[in-house]
Amino acid sequence: SCTTCVCTCSCCTT
């Protein structure tokens, strides 16, 4: 669930 991430969900690994 990467809604706050501007890039792809793959970028949201943090």
Curated annotation (Swiss-Prot):
Subcellular location: Secreted
Modifications made to the protein after synthesis: Maturation of thiazole and oxazole containing antibiotics involves the enzymatic condensation of a Cys, Ser or Thr with the alpha-carbonyl of the preceding amino acid to form a thioether or ether bond, then dehydration to form a double bond with the alpha-amino nitrogen. Thiazoline or oxazoline ring are dehydrogenated to form thiazole or oxazole rings. Maturation of pyridinyl containing antibiotics involves the cross-linking of a Ser and a Cys-Ser pair usually separated by 7 or 8 residues along the peptide chain. The Ser residues are dehydrated to didehydroalanines, then bonded between their beta carbons. The alpha carbonyl of the Cys condenses with alpha carbon of the first Ser to form a pyridinyl ring. The ring may be multiply dehydrogenated to form a pyridine ring with loss of the amino nitrogen of the first Ser.
Cross-link (Thiazole-4-carboxylic acid (Cys-Cys)): 11-12
Positions bearing the Pyridine-2,5-dicarboxylic acid (Ser-Ser) (with C-9) cross-link: 1-10
3-hydroxyvaline (Val) modified-residue sites: 6
Modified residues annotated as (Z)-2,3-didehydrobutyrine in this record: 4, 13
TM region(s), chain numbering: none
Residues bearing PTM O-methylthreonine: 8
GO cellular component annotations of the record: extracellular region
Cross-link Pyridine-2,5-dicarboxylic acid (Ser-Cys) (with S-10), where in sequence: 1-9
Sequence position, cross-link Thiazole-4-carboxylic acid (Val-Cys): 6-7
Family named by the database record: Belongs to the thiocillin family.
Record protein name field: Thiocillin
